[in-house]
Amino acid sequence: GLVFHDGEYHLYYQYNPEGSDHGNMSWGHASSPDLVTWREHPVALPYADDAEIYSGSIVWDGDGDAGFGPALVAFYTAHSSVRRHQAQAIAYSHDEGLTWTQYEGNPVLDRDSGDFRDPKVLRYRGPAGDYWVMSAVEAVQQRVVFYRSDNLRDWELLSEFAAPQVGDGIWECPDLFPLVVDGAQKWVLIISLGMAPVVGGFGTIYFVGSFDGTTFVAEGDFRLLDHGRDNYAGVSFSGLPDEDRTLIAW
């Protein structure tokens, strides 16, 4: 999860606090005033017995929509390797993201799926209204699913996006955001592709199009975000001014 808040960039990353192998997935935390000099903090979200903390995002809920008062709200995939199950859960922080409280009603979104992950949340403000939008993936089915919420806890399915021309592979880490192109607002949808021939293994693609608050419509074929190998799992910071978009990937 990446968020810019009160003049600081906060980077939350998947981390095994007990070793260098994949496992015990938790969220580590580092912060920076300039994206160059970083300060490490204690583990932000530790894994539980049957719930590892997979990728997600963070937003500043200044109006207290979620019922936690003004707070940073983190969205993450709760992963159970025992049950092979993935659902979306939330936690909140009142101390600039240093410590977090798990929401007692977790998970907030469950599709009874083993491959439903990587929630990225943004605030949509447009002709359709003013509400929160979540992008997530059904990774093996190669679909981005879009949900809306007024309170960050109860989510309603809006639409799904697929692109058969991408070919084989799994989809991960979607990121939907507006961007001004030649003076006009467009919407960009970024998707990481794993084990995908079209990117030579692992890489990132993006679509440019429109989003009416419900449905994303691509205006053409996908493009490569980076022509090097293994640019993967990148997401952009929330909390930056609308005209700014900064992304960090593996």
Regions found by a protein language model. Give the residues of each.
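Glycine-rich, charged/polar anion/phosphate-binding loops
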Residues: 232-233
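Anionic-ligand-binding alpha/beta catalytic cores of soluble enzymes and soluble regulatory domains
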Residues: 236
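Beta-rich carbohydrate-recognition and catalytic domains
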Residues: 1-119, 123-173, 180-228, 241-250
